[in-house]
């Protein structure tokens, strides 16, 4: 690929790059031989670096890998026989660059002798301390209503029973939820508990379900409340024996008929 119009590079004095001054030998071969005779480093020209697309703002080289002088006179000897470019477009290698690179390359660092330190002593593993019984959180205190009277304002949402080991551990970790009732709910539950005799029987299942839906209390919660307040409220009001007069009256009516 050749582009016309690219002349040989000329410096300010009008001398082409790479040409020897008139005072030197007439041919590059003679100069090279003279240099070799004087003991100077051999000068070589490698690949062509001429940019053939400089006018278009690109970068294209012809791919010539080494300068080969044309046979003929001194002017033709400065042109490459492979690419036709001037010798100054080829990369010059006079052997000094390799020497400079050798001087710039730092010497390999001397290996450092590692400092011998004694091995670290193994730390003793801490033994787990036995847990004392007083470190465990105490179980929540459950107030049991006494027979002296007084109504309770709270009721547990779970039935009382013999606490197992797992249940006791669970009680120690979480707080039991307690249902709070309004004064109207307490009055209605008290009246209904006295009506059924503070007991839940099978024949009263439908009545209990209807009452719980009306008051807004779950059946299990009402059952626990009635169990907790039976000894304190039921004994003082005498509600445990209210069914007996009713049963006696029904029997007397049947006998009269």
UniProtKB/Swiss-Prot annotation:
Q: Name one GO biological process term.
A: regulation of developmental process
Localisation per UniProt entry: Nucleus
Q: In what ranges is there compositional bias, type Pro residues?
A: 106-125
Q: Which InterPro entries match?
A: Homeodomain-like_sf, Homeodomain_ZF_HD, ZF_HD_homeobox_Cys/His_dimer
Residue span of the signal peptide, if any? Answer: none
The UniProt entry, under SUPFAM superfamilies, shows:
Homeodomain-like
Tell me a GO cellular component: nucleus
Oligomer and partners: Homo- and heterodimer with other ZFHD proteins.
Stretches of Low complexity bias are at 21-35, 141-155, 242-257
Recorded GO molecular functions are: DNA-binding transcription factor activity; transcription cis-regulatory region binding; zinc ion binding
- Name the encoding gene, please: ZHD6
Record-given protein name? Zinc-finger homeodomain protein 6
- For the site labelled Required for DNA-binding, the residues are 226
Which organism is the protein's source? Answer: Oryza sativa subsp. indica
Q: What residue spans carry the region label Disordered?
A: 1-35, 106-182, 228-257
